[in-house]
Amino acid sequence: MIQKLKDFKLTPENTYYATGKRKEAVARVWLLRDRPNTFIVGSDKTNKEYDLREYVQRETLYNKIMYPFKVTGHEGKFGIYATVRGGGISAQAEAIMYGVAKALLQHNPDLRPTLKKAGLLTRDAREKERKKYGQMGARAKYRWSKR
């Protein structure tokens, strides 16, 4: 049975909050100090809460989310509650990872050099390129024949 957000009392004393973005995905992340190894993801699309492993399913995405804890040596010290909106599962996982890194920075500003060296404080700003008129897509063109 997964724990729900209503089971926790979120206060500034026991949580650290940050947002992470990647492509169209936006993640609001709370690190739960009193609840280590509790990982909940709430989807704004379905209005449900899931266990993190159940939500991302792929081990690589789960490891990506946990990477900030691994780099800083804070494995097993915090729980995660995150709400995600928009984008695909991979972009949502990267948004959560970025949010976790920023929340860890709130917990301890001395972690900045470690997180920066691991590349966790730089937002990946690549976005989808827009479709151009007179073309099939952003770069793909319709077939053209001179004669």
Curated annotation (Swiss-Prot):
The lineage of its organism: Bacteria, Pseudomonadati, Aquificota, Aquificia, Aquificales. It comes from Aquifex aeolicus (strain VF5). GO terms for molecular function: RNA binding; structural constituent of ribosome. Keywords: Ribonucleoprotein, Ribosomal protein. The keyword Nuclease does not apply. Belongs to the universal ribosomal protein uS9 family. The keyword Ribosomal protein applies. One of its GO terms (biological process) is translation. Coiled coil: none annotated. This is Small ribosomal subunit protein uS9. One of its GO terms (cellular component) is cytosolic small ribosomal subunit. Residues 128-147 are annotated as: Disordered. Transmembrane segments: none annotated. SUPFAM superfamilies: Ribosomal protein S5 domain 2-like (SSF54211).
